[in-house]
């Protein structure tokens, strides 16, 4: 097997101070509100670093101004030709591509899918297509020319956490409040480029 080198070189965190006067006067749990913001910021950073691996994709599919069914079939073909397993395939797409997929009747209307149409189902996302489990994230890379939407097998990319997201808190006499930080140390890498497809759509 080919040896994969994964460098753990990313340290992401969000820190803040809750002053005692804020904590005392607020009528809600200030620390809990900020903790949610910390989680979102750190997870978004990890998400963005994984999205940045598009440059190492084994195949690029040009979706142009609108992604359609033919583009999706090109993505499927690229993985099939690379002998990528049919199971555990995933797609992470930006809002514009999700909008394009909603407009493809094959994925979204009853007479094509046999399921309640997206327009009336109460579910706004196309969640599956050609064996891919789809999710939407606006953290996909937008280089002002194209957005880079990723389709991949689970073996394509690796995330190694040297320090899982960890909280630290301490009282501060200097600032008369509580210091809080959520941080993590990790690395990301493409492990199997042939199992990663970059579907490009005009920005």
Task: State what each model feature region is.
Residues 1-9, 25, 104-203:
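Sequence/fold signature of self-assembling virion shell proteins
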Residues 5-21:
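A short glycine/small-residue-enriched secondary-structure motif
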Residues 54-124, 128:
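Extended, solvent-exposed, turn-rich assembly/linker loops in the middle of proteins
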Residues 11-15, 51-53, 153-154:
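Short amphipathic alpha-helical segments, especially helix-boundary/capping motifs
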Residues 12, 32, 87, 174-178:
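Residues at beta-strand starts and edge strands
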Residues 18-86, 198-203:
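Alpha-helical scaffold segments that mediate packing/assembly in large oligomeric complexes
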């Amino acid at each position: 097997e080919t040896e994969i080198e994964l460098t753990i070189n990313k340290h992401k965190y969000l820190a803040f101070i809750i002053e005692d006067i804020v904590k005392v006067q607020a009528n809600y749990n200030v620390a809990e509100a900020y903790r949610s913001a910390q989680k979102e910021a750190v997870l978004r950073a990890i998400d963005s670093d994984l999205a940045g691996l598009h440059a190492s994709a084994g195949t690029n599919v040009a979706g142009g101004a609108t992604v359609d069914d033919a583009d999706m079939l090109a993505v499927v073909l690229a993985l099939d030709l690379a002998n990528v397993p049919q199971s555990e395939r995933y797609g992470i797409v930006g809002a514009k591509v999700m909008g394009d997929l909603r407009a493809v009747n094959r994925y979204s209307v009853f007479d094509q899918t046999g399921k309640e149409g997206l327009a009336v189902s109460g579910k706004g996302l196309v969640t599956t297509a050609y064996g891919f489990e789809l999710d939407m994230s606006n953290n996909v890379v937008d280089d002002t020319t194209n957005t880079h939407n990723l389709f991949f097998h689970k073996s394509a990319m690796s995330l190694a956490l040297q320090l899982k997201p960890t909280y630290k808190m301490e009282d501060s006499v200097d600032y008369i409040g509580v210091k809080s930080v959520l941080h993590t140390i990790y690395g990301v890498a493409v492990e199997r480029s042939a199992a990663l497809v970059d579907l490009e759509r005009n920005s």
